[in-house]
Design a protein with these regions (language model features):
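Flexible loop/hinge segments at secondary-structure junctions
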Residues: 19-388
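C-terminal motif of bacterial Sec signal peptides marking the signal peptidase cleavage site
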Residues: 12-17
């Protein structure tokens, strides 16, 4: 079983932020929110904070504080795992994580009903301009699998272009010539394909449709990419809430195809779902694992935007996995009290620390990797800016 560990990584190119549905491809050189990209030197990492490149003013708050978090179902299991250890370190600070999808995480952070909004998608230009002080804080690196329910079929190979045609309703059978051409020698059934997609506003949808936009021009000029898009009308498509819902729906539906965040990989395997090998930019077929995710991030560039918004989609490289992303906690730079601001800083610093939330044990359980060390100083500076 594949386990992610923090490895040497290099920061990807800064690229465009997008709204709930964007026509700009994820490889655009414009940074989200119009920020100027800054160059960071490549550096190895053991997964998280370098411990002291910024004065984050950490410590146990003087009174009990609860940090409410809502959002990404991909990030949620990781936050659940590290919350008790965080409370052990800071007895007056408690993290209260909740799922709901990245769209809910961002909207709750904007509304102030949650101090932290978990999201697989970075903030769009309009979200940032409409909400001054709202920040992207990367806390880990994750990826996304494409799963399927075809008993007796293993090692299935798919491309972003073919997947786009499936979700457009242009490819409807698993033995379609376009799929067969990617799987020479394989016996594919004439089973009807049932595409499953998220019904909630989802960061998983954001990164999945980013790949489709990068590999299929019709998709780019049509649905494009975002946490919510206008999906093509496919008569037999199914919808689901969250990554658990995607796994359950696909398990119950022979012929299904579904995109599932990597933190639900174990659940997908337990459900008997296959995991497709995806064609990368070099033309090779790869599965998501520690080395292919590292290759994707390393194949990006060494520049990052000042607003820390950067996708890692369809990067070059022989072993690069094509759907990789930063996991974000969206936060306001001003909190309601000094103690709450300290608790929020404490948690964010803990989450990225290689002796805190980003230990190999925590990361591996969710198949995550720690932040590249070249990103950490900017992240720590952003954390340090949170005040009351």
């Amino acid at each position: 079983m594949k386990r992610f560990i923090p490895l040497a990584l290099i920061v990807p190119l800064a690229v465009a932020g997008c709204s709930s549905s964007s026509k700009t491809t994820p490889s655009s050189p414009t940074t989200a929110g119009g920020s100027t990209a800054t160059t960071a030197a490549p550096a190895t990492t053991t997964g998280g904070s370098s411990g002291g490149s910024a004065n984050m003013n950490l410590g146990n708050p003087s009174s009990a504080q609860t940090i409410n978090e809502a959002g990404s179902t991909l990030l949620y299991p990781f936050l659940q795992e590290i919350a008790p250890a965080f409370h052990t370190m800071y007895s007056n600070a408690t993290l209260n994580p909740g799922p709901g999808g990245s769209g809910k995480g961002i909207s709750d952070a904007i509304a102030g009903t949650a101090q932290l909004g978990g999201s697989d998608a970075y903030l769009s230009n309009s979200q940032r301009s409409s909400n001054p002080g709202l920040m992207n804080i990367p806390v880990a690196i994750s990826s996304q699998a494409v799963n399927y329910n075809l008993p007796g079929v293993s090692g299935l190979k798919l491309s972003g272009d073919v997947i786009a045609q499936i979700y457009e309703g242009k490819i409807t059978k698993w033995n379609d010539p376009a799929i067969a051409a990617l799987n020479t020698g394989a016996t594919l059934p004439a089973t009807t394909i049932v595409p499953v997609r998220r019904v909630d506003a989802s960061g998983d949808t954001f990164i999945f449709t980013s790949l489709l936009s990068a590999t299929n021009s019709a998709w780019q000029s049509g649905p494009a990419f975002g946490t919510s898009v206008t999906w093509p009308a496919v008569s037999n498509e199914l919808t689901a809430n969250g990554n658990p819902g995607m796994v359950q729906t696909c398990q119950a539906t022979p012929g299904c195809i579904a995109y599932v965040g990597i933190s639900s990989e174990d659940a997908a395997q337990s459900a008997g779902l296959g995991e497709a090998m995806l064609q990368n930019k070099a033309g090779n077929f790869v599965l998501p694992n520690a080395s292919t995710v590292e290759a994707a991030v390393s194949a990006g560039a060494t520049s990052i935007p000042a607003n820390l918004a950067a996708p890692i989609i369809y990067e070059p490289g022989a072993q690069s996995y094509p759907i990789v992303n930063f996991e974000y906690l969206v936060v306001k730079d001003k909190q309601s009290s000094a103690d709450l601001a300290m608790a929020v800083r404490d948690f964010l610093a803990f989450a990225i620390s290689p002796t805190g939330g980003s230990t190999p044990a925590f990361l591996a359980k969710e198949h995550f990797q720690g932040l590249p060390s070249s990103v950490v100083p900017q992240v720590e500076t952003a954390i340090a800016s949170i005040s009351s």
